Amino acid sequence: RQVYGEPDELPVTENAPIKKATSPYGNTKQINEEIVRDTVASGAPINAILLRYFNPIGAHPTALLGELPNGVPQNLIPYLTQTAIGIREKLSVFGDDYDTPDGSCIRDFINVVDLAKAHVIAIARILEKKQKDKVETFNIGTGRGVSVLELINGFEKATGVKLNYQIVGRRAGDIEKVWANPDYANNELGWKAQETLEDTLRSAWAWQLKLRERGIQ
């Protein structure tokens, strides 16, 4: 999603214009795509598939594999689960005055297992020489926009755990709202996000509990 910047139209398709990145992280995403395209265009004997992730969240349903950020998490779900379990005192919600139904930012949250499956399909497509172009691009998202406050409420409902959160000022570089149009990936790759948001949030919480059980966090 970072390659699109602040989109003009929603949901975002692969043909949406690439705008100036709103953060250094977004800029690296755009640069990485340019490097891949330039490498293929140079005549290198390779093809490529660019998967444009939206917001991966969750963990493997067995709770044996998940996200373990170093230090203070830079994305929402680890910070949320660490707050829920008591590692962090409070979760900060950056802004409630955006032009969205509840004022908080909207994102397309995709289960990390669904995302991993998209990689398997993409690799098979390259190896089996099924690509229609030397470089193909696919949005990997659910097609559903969920606000930060909706996500918090969804976590509380899915787990029965109340979150201590506070509204703070906007964070520089945050995009107001963005979610994918995944139709091209659905139709061309035969891939579609399967996991519900509720199950994804439960998996994230189960992973955090497993970390506590192992004495890691």
Label every model-predicted segment:
Residues 2-55, 64-75:
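Catalytic helix-loop patch of NAD(P)-dependent Rossmann-fold dehydrogenases
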Residues 4-6, 57-61, 148, 174:
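A short beta-to-alpha transition loop/helix N-cap that caps and shapes the active-site region
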Residues 4-5, 10-11, 60, 87, ...:
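A short secondary-structure junction motif
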Residues 8-9, 60-65, 105-106, 151:
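Short aromatic-enriched loop/helix-cap "lid" or pocket-rim segments at secondary-structure transitions
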Residues 60-73, 80-83, 89:
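Hydrophobic, Gly/Ser/Ala-rich alpha-helical and linker tracts in large acyl-processing enzymes
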Residues 76-217:
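C-terminal substrate-binding subdomain of Rossmann-fold SDR/epimerase-dehydratase oxidoreductases
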